[in-house]
Swiss-Prot record:
Family annotation (Gene3D superfamilies): 3.40.50.12280
Membrane disposition: Peripheral membrane protein
GO molecular function, one term: NADH:ubiquinone reductase (non-electrogenic) activity
Native source species: Thermodesulfovibrio yellowstonii (strain ATCC 51303 / DSM 11347 / YP87)
Name by which UniProt lists this protein: NADH-quinone oxidoreductase subunit B 1
């Protein structure tokens, strides 16, 4: 419902950081709010389906659930994606490939672990499987289930949108294609994690 107020000329704060100036038909906000709104309203996930959870992920992208209405468009290349959805069992042979794809994604980037196998290793507690994607990548949203329903994936994507909306915009210091990102805050790469576990 839209209320038109002609008598008020002072800015009215409708949300923290967002003001409306009625007489000038102007909205005043911070650049961080606009950037966060843009990032959360247009998620482009890179789908990485490795097992039976991938079938549910494909069903979520089909016309019945229509992810486009949430601003979510599946991408086929990591260079155009900002969210990686890992659905299924991750083997130790596949882990370096996933880490490589993750590092090809532009900042800010997010990871969703979909299914019991991606969250904790699931029923595959063997020497050849990674016991949760968080051993190799920083995970933002966990979606449990074997396999989780498409509604659960949609809820996870909406939770990620809420998280993006509330987090401050990170200054990466990008200048002419060279990004100066503080790597100390990121989780270690797969090779260094693997070497630390041998000690």
């Amino acid at each position: 419902m839209i209320h038109v107020v002609d008598t008020v000329t002072e800015p009215v704060e409708i949300e923290q950081g967002i003001k409306i100036v009625p007489a000038a038909n102007t909205i005043i906000t911070t650049l961080d709010k606009i950037a966060s709104w843009g990032r959360c309203s247009s998620l482009w996930p890179l789908t990485f389906g490795l097992a039976c959870c991938a079938i549910e992920m494909m069903a979520t992208a089909a016309s019945h659930y229509d992810l486009d209405r949430f601003g979510i468009i599946m991408r086929a290349t990591p260079r155009q994606a900002d969210v990686m959805i890992i659905a299924g069992t991750v083997t130790k042979k596949m882990a370096p490939v996933i880490v490589n794809l993750y590092h090809q994604m532009p900042e800010p980037r997010y990871v969703i672990a979909m299914g019991s196998c991606a969250c904790s290793g699931g029923i595959f507690n063997t020497y050849s499987t990674v016991q949760g994607v968080d051993e190799i990548l920083p995970v933002d949203v966990y979606i449990p289930g074997c396999p989780p329903r498409p509604e659960a994936l949609i809820e996870g994507l909406l939770k990620l949108q809420e998280k993006i909306k509330t987090e401050p915009h990170k200054k990466t210091g990008c200048l002419s294609g060279v990004c100066l990102i503080d790597k100390s805050q990121r989780r270690c790469s797969y090779e260094s994690c693997r070497d630390n576990k041998k000690d």
